[in-house]
Amino acid sequence: MTFSLFKEVIMMKKLALLATGFVCAGLLGACSSQGMATSNKDMGQQTAKAGDRQTSGKKVKDFNLQGVDGKTYRLSDYKGKKVYLKFCASWCSICLSTLEDTNELAKEEAGKDYVVLSVVAPTFNGEKSAADFKNWYQSLDYKDFPVLLDSKGELLKEYGIRSYPSALFINSDGTLSKSQIGFMNKEDILKTLENMQ
């Protein structure tokens, strides 16, 4: 192999490595959605308001949402139980990769002191329409936990949800125990639930 050919091969490998780095960086940011562009001042105000709403110990506002299954779900229906409320999106690779764990966690809830609920906001933050989401989700094999449709984006706004996955851990008395942004494995979710009131 000639020296110039060797240099060309090295250069091509460097370019491939650089391209791979850009793809990885894009994937890491894929599950972070900021919606429409806002000024830094507006974003700071939104973040501050979201932080105010997500204070541990604060009473969580009741909601009334329709599920993909057509049933109506209210937070108040679960009074006396701990609630793991997971916000996700169909385009979020992390959310999709954790569906099996979420489903298993929900299967295990029978006889336990907690319940698993998931929330999707159709047409918000790049999500499909409600009809398209229902068709897509019903083709999957995750039937052990309700998926609620926040069609007006009210919960997203109330809890300042801008990244997926995100979760709220709600105590059995209806107060917020913890909010979580990003991936959480099943074992950590269970530990959090066990340590709640």
Each model region followed by its residue ranges:
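A short beta-strand-turn-helix
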Residues: 62-83
